[in-house]
Amino acid sequence: MSCRAMVSPPSRTARAGAVLASSPFVTSQPTEELLREFETVYGAVELTHLTPPQSPPGPATQLLLSYAQQAQCTALAPPAPLAPPQEAWQIVAPVPVNQLPEGYECDLDAVEELVRHRASQLASPQHSSSSANASPRSSPPPSPRSSSTDEDWSAPSRLKTRPVDDRRSRKKEQNKNAATRYRQKKKAEVEVLLKEEQTLRQRHTELGEKCSDLQREIRYLKALMRDLFKAKGLIK
């Protein structure tokens, strides 16, 4: 938008100033200040409106322009008459169905279909819950196929628990056998030691008897030699 479209000519400015001055709602001092600001802004715009396109004015210039336009509009606009109380509330006439667009009926049909679908979905859980409550009373006896399938489903769990039990029982049996072998080994060692002790005791008794016999023979020989030496006169 060009600067000339945004700003009115000087004759319109003078006319706006006269209206602002004659308006009973605006005091003289603010009107003079507004006119002064408007003239400065208009002079700045007139100096630059023949130049090639340039950057937009700064925020201060935009603020002055908007403030001047608002003041001019409020001064030129006549006061709005007060509406009578009877016309304050107006009844809006309903739009006939024939004047509705074609797509609106399709939307209504789609909404009704969605409502019916939702109502059927809400009613189906109640039906399923009632049938579930009534099913235990009239439930048929379990068939052999279902029992076989239950056994098939429970078989893997049993197979999983069996190896653990078998491993534990095998471990206990191994420990028991190892303890039995250890006791048997110790018992055999004790028996061997007892036999060796018995043989050693027998050997000891035999050696003791031989020792006593030898001592007795030595005493007997000593006595004979003494008698012999006495007989020869070698010993007094």
Curated annotation (Swiss-Prot):
Biological process GO terms, please?
Answer: response to unfolded protein
Its domain of life reads Eukaryota
Domain (bZIP) ranges:
165-228
Q: Where is this region: Basic motif?
A: 167-187
* Family according to the record: Belongs to the bZIP family.
Among PANTHER family, the record links this protein to: ACTIVATING TRANSCRIPTION FACTOR ATF 4/5 (PTHR13044), CRYPTOCEPHAL, ISOFORM A (PTHR13044:SF14)
Protein name, per record: Activating transcription factor of chaperone
Q: Which organism is it from?
A: Bombyx mori
Which gene does this sequence derive from? ATFC
